[in-house]
């Protein structure tokens, strides 16, 4: 009952997304909520999620990605503590893992050299990022109200809106916390993915 899952069906016609979303809403009332809309692309799906979110924090998980169950428990425990202690946290950062189809090794994006672990900090506590080390949508959980206050609105029918989602709110972030867990699993390898070079 501490988690709200919004499943946005962005006008999907090629699969059973709508039916699956409705089934989850029936099976987990009060936790899962199905949102059906005309196709607006990835950005509009995120916008719908943000418009409908009632939770303190907001995390986007794309339909072909997933989160690690053990890390998920750690994330919830951390967020719960900030809420319980009545401490404002604008951004929680976690590691993410590239789950590349056919790859023998998994690349983990972590922030150990740039951000102190398990410490509430502001920007003065952040060190220089290394080349190839960057914050992506996969690594952030934002405070919902902060996203609304900064006027975040992603463009419709546009690829690569992830960067706007991550970087537009950053000047509004006053507090952050790095939890060193491999939370988000970013799947790469589907033929029709926008990140596929042939698409």
Regions inferred by a protein language model and the residue ranges of each:
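Nucleotide-sugar donor-binding/catalytic module of glycosyltransferases
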Residues: 1-199
């Amino acid at each position: 009952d501490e988690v709200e899952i919004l499943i946005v069906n962005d006008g999907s016609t090629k699969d059973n997304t709508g039916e699956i979303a409705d089934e989850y809403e029936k099976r987990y009332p009060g936790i899962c909520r199905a949102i059906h809309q005309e196709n607006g692309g990835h950005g509009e799906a995120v916008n719908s999620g943000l418009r409908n979110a009632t939770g303190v924090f907001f995390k986007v998980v794309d339909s072909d990605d997933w989160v690690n169950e053990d890390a998920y428990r750690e994330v919830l425990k951390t967020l719960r503590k900030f809420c319980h202690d009545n401490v404002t946290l604008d951004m929680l950062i976690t590691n993410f893992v590239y789950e590349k189809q056919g790859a023998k090794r998994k690349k983990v994006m972590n922030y150990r050299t740039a951000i102190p672990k398990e410490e509430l900090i502001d920007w003065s506590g952040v060190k220089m990022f290394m080349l190839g080390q960057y914050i992506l949508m996969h690594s952030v959980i934002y405070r919902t109200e902060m996203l609304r206050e900064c006027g975040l609105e992603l463009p419709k029918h546009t690829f690569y809106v992830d960067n706007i989602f991550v970087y537009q709110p950053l000047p509004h972030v006053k507090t952050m916390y790095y939890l060193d867990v491999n939370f988000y699993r970013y799947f790469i390898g589907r033929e029709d993915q926008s990140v596929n070079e042939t698409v």
